[in-house]
């Protein structure tokens, strides 16, 4: 089967070179197609009555409650616009606690009294939907018989048109809550967390005399992914069902030559990227960057910053679009954190900042950061946020897939710390010692080549090993996993920041109330903030063992796996803070904890069952046949009087590995029959018993692969999947 897939993949690539490039989608002008399939501000302004438009804009930009009286007007305009573009259906698109999106399509068609059909879509259908809430994860908040749930239109995220091969659907972003009002999704707490942060940030901005009225978080996620030939994908049951390879010996060449990163993009892959970008531009997703990543067949796409809620929707749309477009080019798109052992896995760097409604980035240091006290206040508050809530941030990116990646010299360590860089670290050290007098200047970089321009050099280097790094005018949360929604990492950051800003605002308000100037109040507060939280600052090599030891001395958490990380979400301090800022209540937090535990256990169990199946039905039968062939060859050579010394060694090695594979497969199968117990106990058993048994079984399978003749090995190999493009 492996050799058949190789033949088909090779033929497909050759055929692509002959005909595929000619039939690839023509490139459209981004400026002409951008947002053409979205019900955006421009469309709303043209199609809505003036009063309705202004009312809707107040809801979107100022978070004012939606006026129910405009719902029918907006719905009619939206329906007419969608039908003009060929839409026949609409859907309330939401993000339940599955980690992916959900949708149910309803037709615009309704029967008329004359026996004909008319298109209907009113305010009621726009504002509220009613999916079955019992069929989605609820963490015990809903029983099977408690099925009622509601979707509620989110006017801050523009609706768009999903164009399929045989029809078009109007997609309306919505929140998802239970009949009792509890959040069953990721959008609802994200919106709540943005409001919580805005409230606390505005307290500080008002002290500085700002005219702003709102603050929002902005973000831009860098999505890493793999592309492999679709023939290889369908020949690997582990990729189909688990998203990653559960067996696979390392190829002679991996990423050792460092020749993949920023390298030439293969023609077929580039055609795929062009098509994806075209589709995303049409629905208003501002993708900006594309390039090869470190591992072979690994790539990255990154957008321009947007408001966090819209960016989260757009990120899910990006992943869905990439999966949908890949088959057109004979490719499979893999978002798993570690689809291939021995080469880098994939992450999703979450670039995060705060901006007011006047367009000011609150994390922009300006030309003289040591004099920009408003920036220093917000930056120091982030020290407090990350130091105090490091466990929450670690939990927000925990998953079975990310366990394969974090701390493996390819991704940030599981220890949460902040990289500030030389310039900011120097300023904070000056402040702690009595006051900042200057800002480090990077100077000019002279390449020594007369025809090349002299370059302004940044005051500090970058640190790719840091999980949370300041990168000029934003923080980059680098530990986020490639396959997860960015919603909960955003929620965790927003709540942590809101709590820290609350503390800072309270201190500054008290000082100003006692007749101190804001400058004096800041001067007194900053040294204490820095001193109390400087342990979280680390500018060194996060991969080094020395850092783990140093982090332990500093008292930082080192939660190395998902099972250790998940309880952070139900710690009393976390519950109290989430409830204080009205983001999630105790019941909602415990539900997410239960769902995360169940997801971890189910994910690993699916992988383990697949490993046993593949060992018994794919590897073992062919290994036994090869063992028989070698045994017959040894007997024939011996009978002819030839030397069988080395052949006998090969036979013994194969026989030993076959026995080992069978024993280890049985051991893993027995581990899967373990009585569940509580969710916590089951998760710990899976981590401590099932995962090591999987590792042991894989070792035997991979060793057998290295001995088997290529034409008889049943699975596409790493060499084929990663390098045949």
For the regions a protein language model found, what residue spans apply to each?
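Active-site core of metal-dependent hydrolases
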Residues: 32-148
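Short, intrinsically disordered, low-complexity segments enriched in Ser/Thr and Pro
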Residues: 110-145, 258, 382, 505-514, ...
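Hydrophobic/aromatic-rich, well-ordered segments within soluble, folded domains that form packed cores
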Residues: 87, 91-93, 312-328, 354-355, ...
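C-terminal amphipathic alpha-helical interaction region
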Residues: 522, 526-725
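A charged N-terminal "starter" segment
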Residues: 2-53
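Glycine-rich, acidic/polar active-site loops that bind/position phosphate-bearing ligands
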Residues: 148-335, 344-594
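Gly-rich Lys/Arg/Thr-decorated short loops/hinges at beta-loop-alpha junctions or inter-strand turns
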Residues: 29-40, 59-61, 181, 252-261
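Short linear, low-complexity motifs centered on an aromatic residue
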Residues: 99-114, 131-134, 139, 236, ...
